[in-house]
Amino acid sequence: SAAISLKEKAPERSVLVLERGLFPSGASTRNAGFACFGSLTEILSDLKKTGPDKTLAVVEKRLKGLEKLRQRLGDTAMDYQPVGGYELIFDKELPALAELEKANELLQHLHPEGTYTNRPGLVKTLGFNPEKVKSVVFNPHEGHVHTGKMMQALLKLAQEKGIEVRTGAEVTAIDNSAGQVTVQVKEPVRGTVGFQAQKVAVCTNAFSETLLPGCQIVPGRGQVILTTPIPGLPWQGAFHFDEGYYYFRNVGNRVLFGGGRNLAFEAETTTVLQDNQQIQQELQRLLREVIIPGQTFGIEQQWSGIMGFTDDKQPIVKKLTDRMVLGFACNGMGVALATTIGEEVALLLADKT
């Protein structure tokens, strides 16, 4: 996204993207594909932690990013489905319903017709366990995308704009001296290869700490499972619960379900891509007991992805030097925020001062 935005602002620039893996391998191709900007309980939690100004600012960036992404790629290319967003309300979240209008008022200038509505009747309609789920909050402004198609469309657009993309190019060091920046890349034959540039953007999100110690972007691993097909799956849409720590959606008639990082914060603060059996088992339990009770299903796939977080949930975009820019920390909202952050990174790179 940053490279595309830079090329749009400065088409005369030669732009190279160095990608560590054969495919983008942190969260880009491993995210759950949610085109969302914040559930009710997540917004209320952010209001308490960071206040209305910061909460509103990041929601606006998420919405702006989703709008720009859809304009840039088109809904068909990334299989965007405007199916709406839903939040499951359990006993402990019932007090949040009393603050629903508070959240709507905060977002009123973004959605004058309203953002969140309490729909308790959906618990039965959508087949959730009524002993566990007490209500459902509906948000008509969200949806989901096909992550693989989205990344293919971004890569195709980048190549059409003349951007060179090198995969399997793991950056091991960045030397900012002698009037230019040298980026060292691991190479299996020669050991390392150096690329020289006038300016460099570090957009490695959760992996930024490796190249830039002290950058204040903390990794957070997300666990995901995908079920076998479920005949007659009674719902479609993008669903969340527990302040956004759990999320699920339909993929056709399968259920993609992820989250649970809050069960093991310390263990999941890592860049190691592997399964956490404690969380994977909890995801399966919640599927059986809450989300699709009474349904027979198997687990077809399971994986993890690495996200980047900051203490105040605000993205980081800043100049490190005249020739280096740091961007990202999507805080679990990469689909929504990446385009906006990329635009801000490009503005700093294109700055001739």
Language-model regions, residue ranges each:
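Glycine-rich FAD pyrophosphate-binding loop
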Residues: 7-30
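Glycine-rich active-site loop/strand segments that organize a redox cofactor
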Residues: 26, 30-60
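Short, well-ordered coil/turn residues at beta-beta hairpins
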Residues: 38, 90, 203-204
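Flavin (FAD/FMN) cofactor-binding and adjacent substrate-gating region
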Residues: 41-47, 71-156, 161
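Helical element adjacent to the flavin cofactor pocket in flavoenzyme catalytic cores
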Residues: 130-198
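C-terminal catalytic lobe of FAD-dependent flavoproteins
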Residues: 141, 289-353
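Central helical "cap/lid" subdomain
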Residues: 185-235
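Active-site lid/adjacent beta-loop-alpha segment flanking the redox-cofactor pocket in flavoenzymes
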Residues: 233-320
